[in-house]
C-alpha cells in the first residue's frame, strides 16, 4: 500500500518525507488556499521534495476549461497528476486528457457508479471520500471493497486513493480492504507512529538502562 500526504504545507512535507514512508502528495483548492502562496510555485516545490505522484486540481467547471488548465498544470513537472472533479464535464475532460497521456485523479467520488464511470473515462486514480461518507451515515468501507472488486474483475488500471482520511482506523481499514493508496493529512502521520504503551515502554527501557549503567 502507498501513503500520500494530503497537504500543501511544504515544510510539513519536507519533514514527513524524511520518515521514508511518503509515496506522493495530494492537494486541492482548499488546501492550496490555506497556504496563501502561488499555486504553481507550491506544486513545483513539492515535486522537488517527493519523488512520486503530486495531485494538483483544476478549478474550471466546463470540460473545455478543465482541459486547458490541465494541459498547463501537466507541464509543471513529470510527476504532476491533474485532479478532476467527478462531474459529467469532468468525465469529458478525463476522457480527452487520458488520450493525451495526461495522468488524472478523479475526485469527490461517493458511489460505485461514480468510480466506475471515472475508470471507464480513463482515470489514472479515483478518490472516494471516507470521512465525508461517514458524516452522512453511509458505509465508506463497502465502497472501497466494491471498487477494488470491480478493478480486479475487469482489469481496470486505475488505482484507488482513499481520501478524506481522519483517523488511523480509517487508514487501517482501507488498507485491509485493498485501497491502493491512503492520502493522509500531515497531523495524522505523527499520531500513527504513537501509542501510550510505546511511550511507556521506551521510558521503562531508558530507566532500567540508566540504573544498570550506575
UniProtKB/Swiss-Prot annotation:
GO MF term set: aldehyde-lyase activity; transaldolase activity
Active-site residues annotated for this sequence: 83 (schiff-base intermediate with substrate)
Enzyme Commission identifier(s): 2.2.1.2
Single GO BP term: carbohydrate metabolic process
Pathways per UniProt: Carbohydrate degradation; pentose phosphate pathway; D-glyceraldehyde 3-phosphate and beta-D-fructose 6-phosphate from D-ribose 5-phosphate and D-xylulose 5-phosphate (non-oxidative stage): step 2/3
Chief localization: cytoplasm
Intracellular or extracellular location(s): Cytoplasm
Catalytic activity annotation: D-sedoheptulose 7-phosphate + D-glyceraldehyde 3-phosphate = D-erythrose 4-phosphate + beta-D-fructose 6-phosphate
InterPro entries named in the record: Aldolase_TIM, TAL/FSA, Transaldolase_3B, Transaldolase_3B/F6P_aldolase, Transaldolase_AS, TSA/FSA_arc/bac
A single GO cellular-component term on record: cytoplasm
Record's keyword terms, sorted: Cytoplasm, Pentose shunt, Schiff base, Transferase
Keyword Translocase: no
Pfam entry (one): TAL_FSA
Function: Transaldolase is important for the balance of metabolites in the pentose-phosphate pathway.
Family membership noted in the UniProt record: Belongs to the transaldolase family. Type 3B subfamily.
Annotated protein name in UniProt: Probable transaldolase
Amino acid at each position: 500500500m502507498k501513503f500520500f500526504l494530503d497537504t500543501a504545507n511544504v515544510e510539513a512535507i519536507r519533514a514527513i518525507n524524511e520518515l521514508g514512508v511518503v509515496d506522493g502528495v495530494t492537494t486541492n483548492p482548499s488546501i492550496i488556499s490555506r497556504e496563501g502562496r502561488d499555486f504553481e510555485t507550491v506544486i513545483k516545490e513539492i515535486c522537488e521534495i517527493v519523488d512520486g505522484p503530486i495531485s494538483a486540481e483544476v478549478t474550471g467547471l466546463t470540460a473545455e476549461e478543465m482541459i486547458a488548465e490541465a494541459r498547463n498544470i501537466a507541464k509543471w513537472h513529470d510527476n504532476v497528476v491533474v485532479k478532476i472533479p467527478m462531474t459529467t464535464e469532468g468525465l469529458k475532460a478525463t476522457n480527452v486528457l487520458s488520450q493525451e497521456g495526461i495522468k488524472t485523479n478523479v475526485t469527490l467520488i461517493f458511489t460505485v457508479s461514480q468510480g466506475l464511470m471515472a475508470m471507464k473515462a480513463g482515470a489514472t486514480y479515483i478518490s472516494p471520500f471516507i470521512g465525508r461518507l461517514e458524516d452522512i451515515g453511509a458505509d465508506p468501507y463497502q465502497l472501497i471493497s466494491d471498487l477494488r472488486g470491480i478493478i480486479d474483475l475487469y482489469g481496470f488500471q486505475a488505482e484507488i486513493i482513499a481520501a478524506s482520511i481522519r483517523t488511523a482506523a480509517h487508514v487501517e481499514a482501507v488498507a485491509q480492504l485493498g485501497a491502493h493508496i491512503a492520502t493522509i493529512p500531515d497531523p495524522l502521520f505523527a499520531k500513527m507512529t504513537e501509542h501510550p504503551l510505546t511511550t511507556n515502554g521506551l521510558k521503562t527501557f531508558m530507566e532500567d538502562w540508566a540504573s544498570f549503567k550506575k
